[in-house]
């Protein structure tokens, strides 16, 4: 009887001992030198920069941006389904306010893709770098040349779109040396009425637009530079088929002067200060629309003065950004109603 009990008590003891043992991994570690990913190759047309497309087509590729289309020109960008009153759109950090009471002159219409370096799109408070916002922000950054060896660069672009018989011609002239650079860009668009499916003409969808942009920089020293920029944009005979009115003329002048300082051997990596001024004139009317017993003219003007001073710093693995900005805007709009047959 004693032998039987001794055997019974040993069984759980040995089972516990075997349970504590771990098996050795027989697979040896392998040092990987490269990883090859096999996938579908993108088409070359998707990689190339389409310099003749519109800024509206460029922005609507983002999942955060939707476009309100009232015509073939100057679509209104909506960030995260928020209206423009709750979002912020800037050009190189400059605050610009439209002059149209019906939002027919979005800020994005004053930049051409041929002169666009990148569009920084932020959601919510991430986009509060150049002002308060709820929905987010879009900052359109234009191309900027760099100092280097003396060279000239010439570009000439032309295109034609069959849907609205749009004629496009653009040119760019750039020059740079060790102390000075200048970039110029010109784009002209002339479009007739758009034709939808079954060759159906959409009346009052024509537009004409001219855009000129220039940027010039001068190196004051090894780590200091000064830069001046100008944008002149003029659109005429712009039709909006979704509205009872059209735009006879829209004109904008945007100027700025920037000073940039890059400290040496300091936690401050960059210090940029800019002063800017812009003025916009926008005039809507319905004089070309048929069967309008009471005409209505709606001109608007907007002027903005502002500045910002932005500092970047790095301390070990931490990055800091300090931005001080201010602006003053004066907007004026009028409405005149008169009978078509006084």
Where are these regions (language model features)?
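Short, acidic, small-residue-rich periplasmic hinge/interaction motif at the N-terminus
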Residues: 21-56, 84
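N-terminal periplasmic accessory domains that precede
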Residues: 48-59, 75-78, 90, 106-111, ...
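Flexible loop and strand-edge segments within Gram-negative outer membrane beta-barrel domains
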Residues: 21-23, 191-193, 203-207, 223-271, ...
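Extracytoplasmic beta-strand/coil segments of soluble accessory domains associated
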Residues: 58-95
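Transmembrane beta-strands of outer-membrane beta-barrel pores
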Residues: 158-164, 177-179, 188-192, 232-236, ...
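Short acidic/polar hinge/loop motifs at secondary-structure boundaries
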Residues: 67, 95-124
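Outer-membrane beta-barrel channels and translocator barrels
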Residues: 84, 177-180, 219-223, 262-266, ...
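Hydrophobic, lipid-facing positions within transmembrane beta-strands of outer-membrane proteins
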Residues: 75, 134-136, 152-154, 167-171, ...
């Amino acid at each position: 009887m004693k032998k039987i009990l001794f055997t019974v008590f040993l069984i759980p003891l040995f089972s516990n001992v075997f349970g504590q043992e771990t098996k050795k991994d027989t697979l040896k570690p392998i040092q990987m030198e490269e990883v090859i990913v096999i996938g579908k190759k993108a088409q070359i047309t998707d990689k190339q920069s389409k310099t003749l497309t519109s800024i509206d087509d460029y922005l609507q590729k983002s999942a955060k941006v939707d476009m309100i289309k009232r015509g073939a020109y100057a679509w209104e960008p909506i960030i995260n389904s928020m209206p423009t009153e709750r979002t912020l759109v800037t050009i190189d950090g400059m605050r610009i306010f439209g002059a149209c009471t019906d939002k027919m002159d979005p800020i994005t219409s004053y930049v051409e893709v041929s002169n666009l370096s990148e569009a920084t799109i932020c959601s919510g408070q991430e986009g509060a770098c150049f002002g308060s916002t709820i929905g987010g922000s879009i900052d359109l950054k234009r191309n900027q040349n760099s100092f280097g060896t003396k060279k000239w660069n010439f570009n000439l672009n032309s295109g034609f779109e069959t849907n609205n018989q749009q004629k496009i011609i653009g040119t760019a002239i750039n020059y740079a040396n060790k102390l000075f650079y200048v970039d110029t860009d010109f784009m002209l668009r002339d479009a007739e009425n758009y034709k939808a499916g079954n060759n159906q003409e959409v009346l009052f969808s024509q537009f004409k637009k001219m855009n000129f942009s220039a940027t010039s920089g001068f190196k004051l020293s090894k780590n200091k530079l000064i830069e001046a920029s100008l944008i002149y944009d003029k659109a005429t005979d712009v039709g909006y088929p979704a509205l009872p009115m059209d735009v006879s003329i829209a004109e904008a002048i945007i100027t700025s002067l920037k000073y940039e300082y890059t400290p040496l051997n300091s936690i401050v990596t960059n210090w940029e200060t800019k002063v800017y001024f812009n003025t916009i004139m926008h005039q809507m009317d319905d004089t070309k629309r048929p069967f309008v017993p009471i005409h209505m003219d709606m001109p608007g003007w907007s002027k903005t003065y502002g500045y910002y001073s932005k500092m970047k710093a790095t301390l070990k693995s931490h990055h800091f950004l300090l931005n001080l900005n201010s602006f003053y805007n004066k907007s004026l709009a009028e409405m005149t109603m008169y009978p078509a047959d006084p």
